[in-house]
Amino acid sequence: MDWGTLQTILGGVNKHSTSIGKIWLTVLFIFRIMILVVAAKEVWGDEQADFVCNTLQPGCKNVCYDHYFPISHIRLWALQLIFVSTPALLVAMHVAYRRHEKKRKFIKGEIKSEFKDIEEIKTQKVRIEGSLWWTYTSSIFFRVIFEAAFMYVFYVMYDGFSMQRLVKCNAWPCPNTVDCFVSRPTEKTVFTVFMIAVSGICILLNVTELCYLLIRYCSGKSKKPV
């Protein structure tokens, strides 16, 4: 599945989201997926080929690169976007299932008085209530967990969010401690900080939406007659 397909699927979820959820999807598309596809790949490029060490020992450069960059930044961000987007796909599946059930009941004649035809069922805005509320709320909760987990993994794996210009490596088969140089470290640091900052904004939006849904749920409960 490419990014265009993912955008199409999540665009369908956007119709059933809250206003805060729509802002989150906009940030996800413009500031994360578009930046990752258009700009970040150009900055990183073939990063292993641009990783230079002051030794001719066969295998030393590859081992040092693998030690300092066990997973490419691009691939880690792509994996993060997949994990963060997956809960939203569950909401889309739930909405599709609910519409399928309404179509089935309409064909059987159980709810013919509620809809004119099947097309009206397809275009009906689905309200976030009942079991869909739990699915939607759970999806937001897991998005926050995935975002925070990947930010932590990123920080631990790369020892911070800034890209070092020079790294020293003494892993085998290097004959001694060698100096290795990272290409375009400043540009990569800027992109890294930007992506982390956008992840933080997404977490803030998700937490805000979660609080909004919980408050609306509690106020709806309190209005019900005892």
From Swiss-Prot:
Intramembrane runs of residues: 2-13
PROSITE patterns with a match to the protein in the record: CONNEXINS_1, CONNEXINS_2
Binding site for Ca(2+): 42, 45, 47
Biological process annotations from GO: cell-cell signaling; gap junction assembly; gap junction-mediated intercellular transport; sensory perception of sound; transmembrane transport
Organism (species): Homo sapiens (Human)
GO molecular function, one term: identical protein binding
Gene coding for it: GJB2
Consequence the record notes for mutating residue 50 to N: In KIDAD and HID syndrome
UniProt protein name: Gap junction beta-2 protein
Pfam families referenced in this protein's UniProt entry, alphabetically: Connexin (PF00029)
Role: Structural component of gap junctions. Gap junctions are dodecameric channels that connect the cytoplasm of adjoining cells. They are formed by the docking of two hexameric hemichannels, one from each cell membrane. Small molecules and ions diffuse from one cell to a neighboring cell via the central pore.
